[in-house]
Amino acid sequence: MARDFPLERVRNIGIAAHIDAGKTTTTERILFYSGVVHKIGEVHDGAAVTDWMAQERERGITITAAAISTSWNNHRINIIDTPGHVDFTIEVERSMRVLDGVIAVFCAVGGVQPQSETVWRQADRYSVPRMVFVNKMDRTGADFLKVFGQIKDRLKANAVPIQLPIGAEGELSGIIDLVENKAHIYKDDLGQDIEVTDVPADMKDEADKWRNVLMETIAENDEDLIEKFLESGELSNSDLKRGIRTGVLKHNLVPVLCGSAFKNKGVQLVLDAVVDYLPAPIDVPPIQGLLPNGKEAVRPSDDNAPFSALAFKVMADPYGKLTFVRMYSGVLEKGSYVLNSTKDTKERISRLVVLKADDREEVDALRAGDLGAVLGLKNTTTGDTLCATDDPIVLETLFVPEPVISVAVEPKTKGDMEKLSKALVSLAEEDPTFRVRTDQETGQTVIAGMGELHLEILVDRMLREFKVEANIGAPQVSYRETIRGSSKGEGKFSRQTGGKGQYGHVVIEMEPGEPESGFEFINKIVGGIVPKEYIKPAEQGMKETCESGVIAGYPLIDVKCTMVDGSYHDVDSSEMAFKIAGSMAFKDAVKKCNPVLLEPMMKVEVEIPEDFLGSVIGDLSSRRGQVEGQSVDDGTSKVSSKVPLAEMFGYATELRSMTQGRGIFSMEFSHYEDVPRNVAEAIISKNQGNS
């Protein structure tokens, strides 16, 4: 079966930004104008098509990256609407990995926010070409040129306006297209009756000025056009279009558009720009991967090339497990067998679907450049490569950040224990930043994630999707332990209980290991003073103790243990006895090696009106924070700091009350650092009291 759209007329794009910039509303309008939906859904009414999870509709935020297909001007556009909340960074990360282009949405009032910078960095990591839509031009305080300036200064982007707003705030009536040098005047509330006319006389000078800036910027980035521009001082409309597209594809240029998705102004022009300026799958470099022999190879975006795809999301679904894939090359047919080259297992493709949010359409095949979902995969998880069984390749996987917060979870009734286990396994399959473990001392199930909201949503999903009611403990910080000194440790386990006894004796030297080395073991036993078969159990005893910690029950990291001596008994020694002796020696050594507690430090960025700067800095200092920098821009203060995660619980509420609801902040993991002695003593005594 032939393709519906040739590859050059396919666009795989993401819509990304910080919270409340209007991403989901922009997506809704795109679907409305392109005919996918016939009624406009509002985020604040809980009716958005892409916010299809119950929690998203209640909270008015986008949690998971919903994939939708639509068409415009005879082009297929596959859209991923990504979340703006930092707890759901993995959703943005996995979207960026599989997209060809991005619309970055900014609020015309708020401008560049901390989360905007995180999203921009993620797009940089995967070299994704992008354009900007400055949204909410109807809002009080909207300032298009101020936001444009912030994009240039803070994001270091070579941005250039290709539009100007006609009016602003309540007076927004239209948009000037600087490429065509025409004005688009909106005559009705739905944004469908548009009059294209000459630029209004009172804006002619402004439009001419910015059109010249556009021509100069394009000429500087395009050798073919610079001579023409220097000779005539003018570029044609088609020159401008070609120059913008070339600049975007080469990452030299970021076109900036404007409008108000909520007021239905400017969205059709955004769709035109997606078609005109963002890349098709064949415009981006072919995907790279590794062959079984370790050599690098590429897969061109071509239906005739060997099949390769990346699984970028796994999702539980009433009909079975949905695995979202980005097709990079070849054709994937339903009923076929493929190789999961990451895990070296074969998988069968039961069914294939393309999605329109929570609506789906079954298809017989997916082709190079498509975004779709597969049913029937049993062993494939996020970041795995699927490829032809006779032509294996492993594609670059996703960057997954480590979780920083954990809570204990237990079912409200004993009978729900099995349901809870199934729910946790299913959720961990979907979300690589969600981890599940069993606490060795208490036997409790502990879940870990990227933040309070992240875990709250997952617990909510356990109830809604898996019908498991759970009791949740208070959020706990993922502390670590390490040592700062060196020493010897000895463990002797000897027990006589009538008949055969138990005997194991281990002596070790302990010292700090290299950063991020975890646990390292070296065997220096010579002359058979401890038989070889008891070395491994002794190491295992040390390793298990290392994982459960010594001073406060947290994993011990970056430690090097060398087994130097010991003794055994011909009759009474056993593997279990040496495992216990190894654990005893490890604990003995740690206590003499100046053990310390480490805590996760978070990079916290706060934006507040200038009037609140003093109280916010004072509050961060009281949370053991280190203020690293501050700047003031047009009445808005930005404070950068490093703060222990333990001090940040409930900060969102505190910041709202300190700034009368006008402050925002972003937080992401930075590094581990020693906990101050007085704080560490309190944590240690609390943990010893609980054990």
Swiss-Prot record:
It comes from the Bacteria. GO terms for cellular component: cytoplasm. Keywords: Cytoplasm, Elongation factor, GTP-binding, Nucleotide-binding, Protein biosynthesis. One of its GO terms (biological process) is ribosome disassembly. InterPro entries: EFG_II (IPR041095), EFG_III (IPR009022), EFG_III/V (IPR035647), EFG_IV (IPR047872), EFG_V (IPR035649), EFG_V-like (IPR000640), EFTu-like_2 (IPR004161), G_TR_CS (IPR031157). Residues 8-282 form the tr-type G domain. It is found in: Cytoplasm. The keyword Calcium does not apply. One of its GO terms (molecular function) is translation elongation factor activity. The keyword Cytoplasm applies. GTP binds at residues 17-24, 81-85, 135-138. CDD domains: EF-G, EFG_III, EFG_mtEFG1_IV, EFG_mtEFG_C, EFG_mtEFG_II. Pfam families: EFG_C (PF00679), EFG_III (PF14492), EFG_IV (PF03764), GTP_EFTU (PF00009), GTP_EFTU_D2 (PF03144). NCBIfam families: EF-G, PRK12740.1-3, PRK12740.1-5, small_GTP. Catalyzes the GTP-dependent ribosomal translocation step during translation elongation. During this step, the ribosome changes from the pre-translocational (PRE) to the post-translocational (POST) state as the newly formed A-site-bound peptidyl-tRNA and P-site-bound deacylated tRNA move to the P and E sites, respectively. Catalyzes the coordinated movement of the two tRNA molecules, the mRNA and conformational changes in the ribosome. Belongs to the TRAFAC class translation factor GTPase superfamily. Classic translation factor GTPase family. EF-G/EF-2 subfamily. This is Elongation factor G.
